[in-house]
Every structure is written in C-alpha cells, then in structure tokens.
Amino acid sequence: MATATDRAPHQVQVHTPTTQRVDVQRRGYDVSGGGVKTFLPDRGPSTSQIIAVLVGVPTGGTLLLLSGLSLLGTIIGLAIATPVFTFFSPVIVPAVVTIGLAVIGILTAGACGLTGLMSLSWMINFIRQVHGTTVPDQLDSAKRRMADMADYVGQKTKDAGQEIQTKAQDVKRSSS
C-alpha cells in the first residue's frame, strides 16, 4: 500500500479566457521529507526590506531608549518635587489658580476680538451684497471721483490764478 510520502504532488492546469496558462502545484507534502519547507517562502527578503530593517531597528531602539529615559526622568522629578509641592501648596495652589485665570482671561479676550472681527467682516460682505457693488467697482468709482476732484481743483486753481493776475493788473493800472 502506498503512503503519503510515496505520492507525487498533483499538477493542476488552469486555463483562463485570456488563454494564459498557469501551473499550480498542490503542496500537501514535501517529497524530500521536510514538512516545514512548504511554509517558507521560495526567495528571501528584497533589498528595500533589508534596508528598512537595518534603518528601522536602530532608529526604533534609539527612540525607545529615549522614551525610557524620559519616563525615568519624569518619575525621579516627580519623586523629588512631590514633597516640595506638598510643603509649598498653600502658596503654589493660589498662584496656579491666578495664572490659570489670567490665561483663560487672555484667551477669552482673544476669542471675543476674533469673533468681533468675523462679525464685522460678515456685516461688510452682507452690505456689499445688498448694494450690489464689488471691490473692483468701488475702486473704479473712487478713481473716477478722484479724477473729477483733481479736475475741479485744477480748474479752481486756474480761476484763482487768473483772478489774482487780473487784480494785479488792476492795481498796476490804478497806481500808474
């Protein structure tokens, strides 16, 4: 009678509609007798995987060491500071409360200022939409008004200059 190690592996041929041929070997048992070999990959890790491990392990180890030292320093600092905090708590607690309230007040003032600016911006945009004017239209209108004002001032200056010249000639004639 034949045993499981005497049998050859079964071959299966799969034909796909794209006429590609794929050979699949069913691996139930290894003919050479090593059952563990069927679970190992046929090829080793790629170069990028090796580089990732070579870079990642020392980096991760260093970061783990630093986090451990940080934890140790925190525990030592807490062990030293706890009696000091307990002794000075009548002074420290009111100071912390005062500083906390001051920080909360500053943050609240900033939030109110920011809310005010946002409200002002919303009102300006709302008024612009109601009047139907946009910034470029307003700039063009302002340019036209400035040009008109410059023409008006220029004309008034000419008129004033002519009036002064006329008065000067009148004074010159009357004195002669």
Swiss-Prot record:
Transmembrane regions listed in the UniProt entry: 61-81, 87-107
Region (Disordered): 156-176
Keyword Phosphoprotein: no
Origin superkingdom: Eukaryota
Subcellular locations according to the entry: Lipid droplet; Membrane
Protein name in UniProt: Oleosin Ara h 14.0102
GO BP annotations, alphabetical order: lipid storage; response to freezing; seed oilbody biogenesis
Membrane disposition: Multi-pass membrane protein
GO cellular component, one term: membrane
UniProt similarity note: Belongs to the oleosin family.
Subunit structure comment from the entry: Homodimer. Forms oligomers.
Chief subcellular location: other
Keywords per UniProt: Acetylation, Allergen, Lipid droplet, Membrane, Transmembrane, Transmembrane helix
Alphabetized Pfam families for the sequence: Oleosin
Keyword Translocase attached: no
Tissue: Expressed in seeds (at protein level). Not expressed in leaves.
Modified residues (N-acetylalanine): 2
Function: May have a structural role to stabilize the lipid body during desiccation of the seed by preventing coalescence of the oil. Probably interacts with both lipid and phospholipid moieties of lipid bodies. May also provide recognition signals for specific lipase anchorage in lipolysis during seedling growth.
